């Protein structure tokens, strides 16, 4: 099983990053996609992906950091995307929940990254919070120019999920679905996601599954917990976990064009 969303550049992993990666593979994870959320972290993610086997990375600017976007950023992302470890542009998108960057700054950076991905024929790794309508409006003109797209850490509604799937967008599901307080709506729509459009992820070190036992004392999530998330998703979808692992792995290979 492949974790499509690991924030391995996080300072929370600074002291034991090697052990975190080793634990993931010991637990049965067979590949990691390391998320780049700004230029500096995208550069770090690429270096980590080169350092560890069966790891790849994304290169892009998260909506929270969109105020940093400038011409030099674009040039650096394009240069970074030429590295073999980098297999997607992102994390890019819109987040109108907290607006750490203004909506205008977010939209400018998002469209710029969609254009880069289209020009480089690379898939996009996307983020959307409380911005679905505007997100889809900006994305729609680019979808037929992109080889693929995933909306990572999906937490939206049934209608939003169906709108994405209808346009060929992959849906990334995290341990959010294991949260009995805020993940119930997501849990109910799990069976409606076509298996061929489903991807799984931890978003580590964030989103530690609330039903994980025993819970780590650090309360830190890590990719070794992906098997737990997979098992819970398979249970709620009424599918065999091994089959779902193989299916989501095949989806990773199709979307990102990688072998593992």
Curated annotation (Swiss-Prot):
Q: What keywords would UniProt list here?
A: Cytoplasm, Exonuclease, Hydrolase, Magnesium, Metal-binding, Nuclease
Which residue pairs form cystines in this protein?
A: none
Question: A Gene Ontology molecular-function term?
Answer: magnesium ion binding
Q: Which residues bind a divalent metal cation?
A: 91, 127, 152
Classification via Pfam families: TatD_DNase
- Known cofactor(s): Mg(2+)
Entry keyword Amino-acid biosynthesis: no
- Kindly give the PROSITE patterns that the UniProt entry links to this protein: TATD_2, TATD_3
CDD domains xref list:
TatD_DNAse
Q: Which Enzyme Commission number(s) are listed?
A: 3.1.11.-, 3.1.13.-
The listed locations are:
Cytoplasm
GO CC, alphabetical: cytoplasm
**Entry function:** 3'-5' exonuclease that prefers single-stranded DNA and RNA. May play a role in the H(2)O(2)-induced DNA damage repair.
The protein's assembly and partners: Monomer.
Q: State the PANTHER family in the record.
A: DEOXYRIBONUCLEASE TATDN1, TATD FAMILY DEOXYRIBONUCLEASE
Family, per entry: Belongs to the metallo-dependent hydrolases superfamily. TatD-type hydrolase family. TatD subfamily.
The entry's protein name is 3'-5' ssDNA/RNA exonuclease TatD
| Species the sequence originates in | Shigella flexneri serotype 5b (strain 8401)
What is the taxonomic lineage of the source species? Answer: Bacteria, Pseudomonadati, Pseudomonadota, Gammaproteobacteria, Enterobacterales
Q: Which gene encodes it?
A: tatD
């Amino acid at each position: 099983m492949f974790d499509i969303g690991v924030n391995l550049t996080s300072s929370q992993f600074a002291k034991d990053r090697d052990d975190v990666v080793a634990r993931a593979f010991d637990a049965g994870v067979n590949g990691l996609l390391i998320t780049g959320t700004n230029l500096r972290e995208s550069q770090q993610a690429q270096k980590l992906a080169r350092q560890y086997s069966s790891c790849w990375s994304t290169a892009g600017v998260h909506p929270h950091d969109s105020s940093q976007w400038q011409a030099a950023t674009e040039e650096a992302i394009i240069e970074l995307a030429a590295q073999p470890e980098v297999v997607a542009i992102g994390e890019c998108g819109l987040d109108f929940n907290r607006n750490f960057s203004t909506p205008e700054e977010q939209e400018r950076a998002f469209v710029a990254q969609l254009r880069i991905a289209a020009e480089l024929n690379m898939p996009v790794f996307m983020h959307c919070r409380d911005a679905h309508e505007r997100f889809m409006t900006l994305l729609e003109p680019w979808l037929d120019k992109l080889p693929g797209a995933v909306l990572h850490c999906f937490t939206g509604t049934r209608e939003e999920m169906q709108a994405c799937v209808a346009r060929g967008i992959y849906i990334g599901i995290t341990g959010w679905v294991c949260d009995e307080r805020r993940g119930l709506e997501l849990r109910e729509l799990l069976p409606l996601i076509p298996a061929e459009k489903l991807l799984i992820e931890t978003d580590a070190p964030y989103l530690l599954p609330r039903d994980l036992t025993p819970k780590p004392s650090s309360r830190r999530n890590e990719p070794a917990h992906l098997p737990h998330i997979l098992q819970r998703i398979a249970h709620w979808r009424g599918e065999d976990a091994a089959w779902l692992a193989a299916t989501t792995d095949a989806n990773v290979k199709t979307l990102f064009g990688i072998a593992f």
